[in-house]
């Protein structure tokens, strides 16, 4: 194997399967969220309903995050990932049914909404376990020496699928409707399940058998609070995202303000991932190693300016750029 070979990780069959699996999961999940946001706002025309969607996902995702990390450390990663993908498949099937006109024709709008919220809540639970499981499995698929290369490929696939998922969702809603768009999501989850069968069961490395869960969680929290750099970066990022995120409002902008339809909504939803992917490429050539703190503050300031610009804009292309 050549030194500094950019394709070194791709020479491992299981890693290629892993990339396909991750693409299917991220593509399907991001597409599903777009479809559901559009459907819920179309049903209610109430901004609060979009806030409830976010709340239903974030509550289980955050409340279970530390607990999920502890469980992932204790369990076999492939088997746990299988359960996560199976859970996602069940959620996709449920949303597929509750967007199917013949199935929901006798249900009230409120019943449909509550059912969608329920499946979104289950999705938050699955996501809490899915993230740490994916990263833990990646570390077991490739040798340690090429892990940085594998992580780069994995991150690139994540960014690409994050861009394509929303974009495809927007066009598919317009072309084939919400229900059949959900069938694509269901197909992605089933494909991921099949792909996972090509990855062998991995051993549990250094399991901390019998370690109390509260002790494990306390250790993780203590590490974060004792590391001022990590704590500061996490806090700054959390505040910016918590008070500045406009993503949840995009269906309102797409339907009522910009009037760009589902295709425009998909483009708007994909725009942040496009920006993140471009910055990933830039950072590969211009590493942010010097004055990282000041650069982070500058990025947060620029983020705020973009949010203000987006909020004031009534021009579609300017909103996409923001």
Descriptions of predicted regions:
Residues 16-36, 55-72, 76-91, 115-173, ...:
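Substrate-agnostic recognition of the 12-TM MFS/MFS-like secondary transporter fold
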Residues 41, 94-99, 123, 196, ...:
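MFS-fold secondary transporters
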Residues 102, 134-136, 140, 178, ...:
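Helix-loop junctions on the cytosolic side of multi-pass membrane transporters
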Residues 97-119, 309-322:
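Helix-loop junctions at membrane interfaces in 12-TM secondary transporters
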Residues 38-43, 96-105, 164-184, 256-257:
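Transmembrane alpha-helix termini and helix-breaking/packing motifs in multi-pass membrane transporters
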Residues 1-15, 201-235:
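Juxtamembrane intracellular "pre-TM" segments in multi-pass secondary transporters
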Residues 63-67, 74, 78-80, 84-90, ...:
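C-terminal transmembrane bundle of multi-pass solute transporters/carriers
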Residues 31-35, 176-183, 222-278:
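A single, central transmembrane helix in multi-pass transporters
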